[in-house]
Design a protein with these regions (language model features):
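Conserved alpha-helical scaffold segments that buttress catalytic/binding sites
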Residues: 2-266
Length: 266
């Protein structure tokens, strides 16, 4: 169980749903261990948040457990989408814990937001990668099949074709050096927030599948999550693997908790 997630399903305002998919990782595998590692390393955190004057155990968080992958990624994503959509229909905010970034496709389809906001080192705008259209490098492309707009925060690498796609009017890219000064302005739009832990510099979170230097510090990511959370109707944190001493999992778990605190306070 995610520490502090003591609510039962009927009373839950938030639901942690593990999604340990590790099917299309192209460099360092291990994202299947992400949900387990977040639950483990979150044991070290205090219950109380001084930013919002709230305790995590008072915020009606439920842990659904893990939705285990099948051999068919498309089938798995549809089942995961249904699981997350059921929580939405119950008035519960889904908090997906990956697993590779491909699980975000299920989250976005379940929430059906106007705006997709993502902290990520990569553009993820491929239509297909390595012959696979359901790949961690295609997530923003699939998100834009649902959302009207994508805001990619901290993106610093991609193919020439991806950068061409990112130059179109429905995509906003905020470079790492500008993220701290970025201010969300969504109006009445619904929002989905995804956190790929590789948005962080590898010196901060080395335990991820495709690390990319010159990234964000943890404090900047924390501020983004807190700023976006009040407008968000769904959240995920993804791409944590088991190839470090817990740095990536600690950051990811802390950002999930920051989302809950800020959303409940908003």
């Amino acid at each position: 169980m995610f520490p502090g997630a003591r609510a039962d399903r009927e009373s839950a305002a938030y639901a942690v749903v593990g999604a340990p998919l590790d099917a299309s990782t192209t460099f360092q595998p291990g994202t299947r261990f992400g949900p387990r590692r977040l639950r483990h390393f979150a044991q070290a955190f205090d219950d109380f948040d001084h930013h919002t004057d709230q305790s995590f155990t008072d915020l009606a968080v439920h842990d659904h457990g893990d939705v285990h992958p099948t051999d068919d990624t498309a089938e798995y994503l549809d089942f995961l989408r249904g699981t997350l959509a059921d929580y939405r229909e119950e008035g519960t905010v889904p908090l997906t814990v990956g697993g590779e970034h491909t699980v975000t496709v299920a989250g976005v389809r379940a929430v059906d937001p106007d705006v997709y906001v993502c902290l990520d080192a990569h553009l993820d705008l491929y239509e297909a990668y390595a012959g696979n259209d359901l790949n961690h490098a295609t997530v923003a492309h699939h998100a834009l099949e649902v959302a009207d707009e994508a805001v990619l925060l901290g993106a610093r690498t991609g193919s020439d074709g991806e950068w061409d796609r990112a130059a179109e009017g429905d995509v906003t890219v905020v470079s790492p050096e500008d993220v701290a000064d970025w201010t969300p302005d969504f109006g009445d739009c619904s929002v989905y927030l995804s956190v790929d832990i590789d948005a962080a510099d590898p010196s901060v979170a080395p335990g991820t599948g495709t690390p990319e230097p010159f990234g964000l510090d943890g404090a900047t990511m924390h501020e983004v999550v807190r700023a976006v959370a009040p407008a968000a109707e769904g959240f995920d944190v993804v791409e944590v693997n088991d190839r470090d001493d817990g740095q990536a999992a600690v950051l990811a778990a802390k950002l999930l908790r920051a989302f809950v605190y800020a959303h409940a306070d908003g």
